[in-house]
Regions:
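Aromatic- and Gly/Pro-enriched, solvent-exposed loop/edge beta-strand patches characteristic
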Residues: 1, 62-159
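Short beta-strands within extracellular/lumenal beta-sheet-rich domains
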Residues: 28-45, 104-110, 185-188
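Short, surface-exposed beta-strand/loop patches at domain edges
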Residues: 1, 117-119, 127-209
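Solvent-exposed residues in well-ordered beta-strands and their adjoining turns
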Residues: 42, 57-59, 111, 128-130, ...
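A short beta-strand element within beta-rich, extracytoplasmic domains
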Residues: 1, 47-61, 123-127, 183, ...
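Threonine/glycine-rich low-complexity segments that form extended coil/beta-edge repetitive scaffolds
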Residues: 23, 27, 31, 35, ...
Length: 210
């Protein structure tokens, strides 16, 4: 499924400094400037998966404006406009964790397990906010893993391959998407596990009618 990024795979923006991407939405207007990350439900899960939550890693946040995560289908290679049922979570700033080394996750938990069919279907994680102050950690090919940026040069880890099947997308209006093939959002997907070794019991009764 390609569900998670490698730990600390945040790119470096300039002169060995952390690289971050902004998830934003224009205040008071319909146009949105989100970012999105595609992922694939591989043939390892032919019957699909039930997502329970997603961890995203933020470098900064707003003091009063929330941030929204959505799950959308990928259509013709780009994030679609529809939201998977129950696939939207809104977090207030006090629910968002930030870190300067991409080490502390922020968990977006769905109200109900979110079913995504298998057969190599692709979906997108979309981050939107009315604030310009949200910055999410990403990786960039050829740059240094932020978790090793403070180590001597010979101990630093270079990002030499993408950690999963997918691509980062950027948008100026929420409708037109531009892929960034060498960048990826840092995230972790959690799925439900069901115990099929036990039998369920359902009890029905009919009330006595007068």
């Amino acid at each position: 499924m390609g569900p998670s990024s490698r730990d600390g795979k945040a790119g470096i923006g300039r002169a060995n400094r952390p690289k971050k991407e902004r998830s934003r939405r224009r205040r008071g207007g319909r146009n949105r400037d989100p970012i999105a990350q595609s992922f694939q439900i591989t043939d390892e899960y032919p019957n699909g998966v039930f997502l329970t939550s997603i961890d995203v890693f933020f470098q900064s946040k707003d003091e009063s404006i929330p941030v929204t995560l959505q799950i959308r289908p990928v259509e013709t290679g780009l994030p679609g406009s529809t939201i998977i049922p129950f696939g939207e979570v809104i977090l207030d700033p006090d629910e968002v964790n930030i870190s300067q080394d991409a080490s502390i996750p922020t968990k977006f938990t769905f109200d109900a397990p979110l079913y995504l069919p298998g057969d190599n279907n692709r979906f997108a994680i979309v981050l939107i906010s009315n604030s310009l102050n949200y910055n999410a950690w990403i990786s960039r090919m050829g740059e240094v893993d932020i978790s090793t940026a403070g180590l001597p040069d010979e101990q630093q880890v270079l990002i030499s391959q993408q950690p999963y099947l997918g691509s980062l997308f950027k948008s100026q209006n929420g409708a037109t998407w531009d892929p960034s093939q060498f960048e990826d959002l840092k995230f972790t997907i959690f799925q439900a596990e069901f115990n099929t070794d036990t039998s369920g019991v359902a009890r029905f009764f009919s009330p006595q009618l007068q």
